[in-house]
Design a protein with these regions (language model features):
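Acidic/histidine-rich helix-loop elements
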Residues: 56-75, 96-98, 127-138, 257-268, ...
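N-terminal active-site segment of His-dependent metallophosphoesterases
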Residues: 25-108, 128
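Beta-strand-turn-beta hairpins that frame and shape the catalytic cleft
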Residues: 46-60, 171-172, 178-190, 217-219, ...
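Conserved beta-sheet core of the metallophosphoesterase superfamily
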Residues: 227-310, 318
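Hydrophobic alpha-helical topogenic segments used for membrane insertion/localization
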Residues: 10-33
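Binuclear metal-dependent hydrolase catalytic cores centered on His/Asp/Glu-rich metal-binding motifs
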Residues: 132-133, 138-171, 175-177, 183-224, ...
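Active-site neighborhood of phospho(di)ester-bond hydrolases with catalytic His/Asp-centered motifs
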Residues: 60-63, 88-94, 117-123, 174-176, ...
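Core catalytic region of metal-dependent phosphoesterases/phosphodiesterases
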Residues: 73-182
Length: 320
């Protein structure tokens, strides 16, 4: 018999609420794992940084592909990106999520290698992913696989083979290097670093001397995997016209209407994805942080943060 104070009906209501919450949670997990992580998109941005009179120039920014064998949807989408016919492809690392992913990755990126490209590595181009506590990201950036605090021996990836494959395709390695390319009559001076998340960055400065068109107008583009503030400060103070980075996955799991909860580095979470302006010592530089294309195969889930490539259309600076 139910008590007169209605406690039985109260417990029944509470049970229904708990059941609804559990069902909602399960639905969100299924959506994030089965739908959103394969719901690829191209984010388009425009930025006026080219010399006066320059024609529009398109840059396709790829990052955090995290490919594993069998990811056919991702590989098919990567091949289709060639239809964008970019003037330049910039790959900011973390291409792999499996020791056997190099050949499938190079096949998927093959059509894009018909276009000029540059690249830098991320930690997941050196080491295979590990199973980590996802709540650990709220305490700060994940530890390096090389860290002394790690008790597990990291599984090394064939980084040399990956970079050789990119090089065979004509892409330029910017790992702690500087290089000039003349594209559509504009001299692009690139300066790249090895992954700051591994504390491997060494600054090469900007290219010296001349490319094939030494008198061409210069545009300085800095490239890094992880957008740590020290790296953004350095390139901004070194007069970069644009900085491109990845690593954050855009937060990977976001709250609708709020955004990223973590950035996996010291970048403020509101900067975890998108085109923003970085300030340092009175200077400013636009920074594009890609939300990434993949996830670690140990955490195959995205929520309110679709996987993306970024198509940047660079245009001429306005006439003063």
């Amino acid at each position: 018999m139910a008590r007169a104070d209605g406690s039985s009906s109260g417990w029944a209501t509470l049970g229904k609420v708990a059941g609804l919450a559990a069902a909602t949670g399960a639905g969100c997990v299924a959506y994030g794992a089965l739908i959103e992580r394969n719901w690829f998109t191209v984010r388009e941005e425009s930025l006026a940084i080219l010399p006066h009179g320059s024609a529009p120039f398109t840059v396709l920014h790829l990052s955090d592909i995290h490919l594993a064998p069998g990811q056919e949807k991702k590989m098919g989408w990567l091949r289709e990106l060639a239809r964008l016919e970019p003037d330049l492809v910039v790959n900011t690392g973390d291409n792999l999520s499996h020791t056997e992913a190099i050949r499938p990755l190079l096949d998927a990126l093959g059509p894009l290698m018909d276009f000029p490209g540059v690249f830098v590595p991320g930690s997941n181009d050196y080491f295979a992913p590990r199973l980590n506590n996802p709540f650990g990201y709220f305490r700060g950036p994940s530890s390096s696989p090389e860290s002394r605090t790690q008790r597990r021996v990291p599984i090394k990836l064939d980084t040399a083979a990956l970079h050789a494959g990119f090089g065979m395709g004509g892409w330029v390695n910017l790992t702690n290097r500087a290089q000039s390319l003349v594209l559509k009559g504009i001299r692009f001076d690139f300066s790249g670093v090895d992954d700051p998340h591994l504390n491997r960055e060494k600054y090469a400065g900007w290219p010296r001397g001349s490319a094939s068109q030494g008198s061409a107008p210069h545009v300085k583009v800095a490239v890094a995997h992880a957008p740590y503030q020290r790296v953004l400060d350095h390139f901004t103070n070194d007069r970069a016209d644009l900085i491109l980075a990845g690593h954050t996955h855009g937060g990977q799991v976001c709250l609708p209407g709020y955004g990223a909860l973590v950035s996996n580095c010291d970048l403020p979470t509101w900067r975890a994805k998108g085109l923003t302006v970085w300030q340092s010592d009175g200077r400013t530089t636009p920074v594009n942080v890609s939300g990434g294309i993949g996830t670690s195969r140990m955490a195959p889930f995205r929520f309110a943060c679709r996987p993306e490539a970024v198509l940047l259309t660079l245009t001429a600076k306005p006439t003063v």
